[in-house]
C-alpha cells in the first residue's frame, strides 16, 4: 500500500466493502474501473482495456465509461448478472483541498433496477427472499419499481420451487447456504443468488407478531433492498400475505410445456398464451395479465366475478372501444410513482402522470353508463383533481429531460422565478440589440456575440475582417485567439454578463428547488395513485379478455358441480391463431367421475400433443376468468395441472431424458388429487420397449385406482388399448388419419376407439427420409408382423386384483433370466458389503431401511436419484 497513491488507496478501501460488485468509481466526467473489475467490464461491455501508471513495473488494468451515458453500460452489466456499486464524488473538486470524499450511493442489482430503460415495461422485475426452518419455509418478494410486496409460507420444497417459478425473480436473497440441488433448481430461473447472513439493526414496518418466519423473510428482503438502494423507498407498499393454495399450481415444466409465457423453440413471448391474450393498452395491464396467467384462480366466486365483467365489456362494443382509447393515454402509473418516491423522476415523467390521471374521470363516466352492479371497480375509481390541478398549474407541457437546466415551470407559477427569467430575457434582448449596434459601428456584418461556459459572453470577429480593424479604437479587449477568428470583450458586455448570468443561474437553481418541492408534494399521493393503478390494470386485462373473445369467437365457460369436463368443438387458441382459422379442426372432450382417463393413440404429427395441450390451456383460461376457444365449455375447477410432454435432458444436473421423464411423472403421481389435470405424452419412450410399456401401464393403473385425476395419456404402446376392459375409468380415443395411395392424410379429428396402426413409416416418408431407408423399413416391418402378429398382446402385463403396486410377478421379469450371463466372480466383485462397518453412514442407513417390497419402480428410481445427489 505504501506505493499506492492516495486516490487508489481510497479506491481499494471502498472496493473491499463491495467485493461482490463491479465498482464504478467516479473520477471527473468518467466512472473508472480497476484491476479485475476492469478486465471483466471491458470484456462484457466491449470497451478498451488500458493501464494506469503504464510506465511503472506493475501497471493497473483500467477502463472507464462517461458518466452521462453510464446507464446503458450499467444495464448491460446487470443483464449479464453483475452487480454494480456506483461510487460518487460527494464534494466539488474545485472547492475541496486534498482528496475528494467519495462513497457508494447505490448498488444496482438484477432485482433492483429502477431506470426507465433498464426494465421491460410489460414485465415485473421481482427480487425474492426465503428463509427455512424445516419443515416450514417462508417466502417474500418485491418489485422495487412498482412497490409491490408480498409474503407467504408453506411446508414443502416443491411449493417453494413452484412459487419461484411462478414469480420468476431476477434475483434471490437467502440468509444461509442452500443445497447444491436446490441451487440448481433455482438457477433454472435466475443465476443471481445472494447470501446475506448479517442484517442491519434497522427494523422495517412489517408486522412481526403474526408469523415469525414470514416476518424474517420480509425483513431479510427489505434490509437487502435498503442496503443496495440507500434512499427513500416509501412507495413500497405494506406487505400483503397470500396463500399458494389459493391458486392453481403449475410447476416449471408445466408452464414450459404449455408455453404459457415463453415459447420453447424461440424463447420469446411470440407463440405463447400471453402473446395471444395480450390486447392490453397499458404496461400495468400487461404485467397484470402475466400474473393472472401464472396464477389462475380456484375460487369459483372470483372467477365468475371476472367473467361477469368480460360479459359486460363483450356486450358493449362501442363502450369497450372507447375505454381502449382512454387506456391508450394512460402511462405506467405504478413505475412513475416508484420513481417519484425513489427521487429519479423528471418533469416529463410528471407530465405523463398528469395525462394519466386526467383520463380517470373519463373512464369513471364511461363505466357509470354500464352495469354498475357488475363493474364494481367504478366505485373505487377516484379522480385525483387536486393532484391534477397542481401538475397543470406548475409544469410546462414539454419540459426538458434534465431537471437541472431550467425551463420546467410555467410563467406565473412563482413570482421570484418570473423576475429572474424576465431579467435573463431582457438581458438577451439587450445582447441582440448590442450585436446589431456593434455591426453598424464597426462595419463588420459577420460580427456576432456568442457564449460558452469557459469565457462567458464575447464578441467574435473572423480573421478576414481583422486586416484593417483596430480593436482598441472600439474599446475591444482581446480574450481568445483562434485559427480563423479573434474573440473580444468590452466593459459594457462584461457588466451585462454578470447581470444576465446571475439571473440565469438563480433561475435554474430556484427551478430545481421548486421541482424538488413539487416531487415531495406528488409523493403524498403515492398510496392513492397505486390504488388507481391496480384498478386500471385489472380493467385493462378484462377488456383485453373481451377483445380476444370477440376477435376469435370464444365463449363463456361454465363450471360443473360434479367435476365434469365437457368441451364441444374446442380449439388450441395459439395454434388456431397462427394458422388459417377455417383450417383448424375442432375436437370434443368429456371426462367425468366415471370416465376420467383418455388413452390417446394415433400417428406422430396427427395432433395428439396439441389436443392435450388445448384441454389444459382452456382450463387455465377459464380459471383466469376469460372466455375460451370452444362452442361450449363445462369445466371443473382444477387445483393443479401436471404435464409430461416432449423429450428434454436436464444437462445442468446431469439427468437423462428418461430420468427427467420419471421425475416429472413422480410429481404428478405423488401430488395429484381428484381435482387435478394430468397430461402425459408418450411416457416410457426413453427406455426399453418392455420397461416403458410396464411403466406406462403402472402409471395408468395408479391414476385409475389412487388419485382419480382427470388424465390425458397419449401413447404408441398399442398394447395398452386393451386396458379399457379392466379399467372402467379409461376410454380409448384416437386422432384419425387415412392412408390414400400410399400417402398419409392427417384428419386431426379425435374419435372414439383405438387406432390399429402407428403409420410410422408413412410419417418418415413425409419427412423425406431416403427411399432406400423407407423400403428397408417396410421389409423389416413385414417380417416383424409375420413373426409376432399385427397386434401384440399384453397378457404378461395383466393387472393383479387390488394390487396397485408393480412387483416382480406383474412385470413377468426374472432376476435369474437377466443375470444368467454373469459369472459368480462377477457377482462377487459387484456385491460389496455396504454395511461392513459397525459405524453406518447416513446414506448406508437410508439404503438399508428401504422397504423395497412396498416401493413402485418409479419411487425406487427417484429415491436412487436422491441418493446419487447426496453423494455428489
From Swiss-Prot:
Biological process, per Gene Ontology: mismatch repair
GO-annotated molecular function: ATP binding; ATP-dependent DNA damage sensor activity; damaged DNA binding; mismatched DNA binding
SUPFAM superfamilies noted in UniProt: DNA repair protein MutS, domain I, DNA repair protein MutS, domain II, DNA repair protein MutS, domain III, P-loop containing nucleoside triphosphate hydrolases
InterPro entries, A to Z: DNA_mismatch_repair_MutS, DNA_mismatch_repair_MutS-lik_N, DNA_mismatch_repair_MutS/MSH, DNA_mismatch_repair_MutS_C, DNA_mismatch_repair_MutS_clamp, DNA_mismatch_repair_MutS_core, DNA_mismatch_repair_MutS_N, DNA_mismatch_repair_MutS_sf
UniProt GO cellular component terms: cytosol
PROSITE patterns on file: DNA_MISMATCH_REPAIR_2 (PS00486)
KW ATP-binding (keyword) present: yes
Pfam family, one: MutS_III
Family: Belongs to the DNA mismatch repair MutS family.
Task performed by this protein: This protein is involved in the repair of mismatches in DNA. It is possible that it carries out the mismatch recognition step. This protein has a weak ATPase activity.
Name of the protein in its database record: DNA mismatch repair protein MutS
Organism (species): Staphylococcus aureus (strain NCTC 8325 / PS 47)
Lineage: Bacteria, Bacillati, Bacillota, Bacilli, Bacillales
Gene: mutS
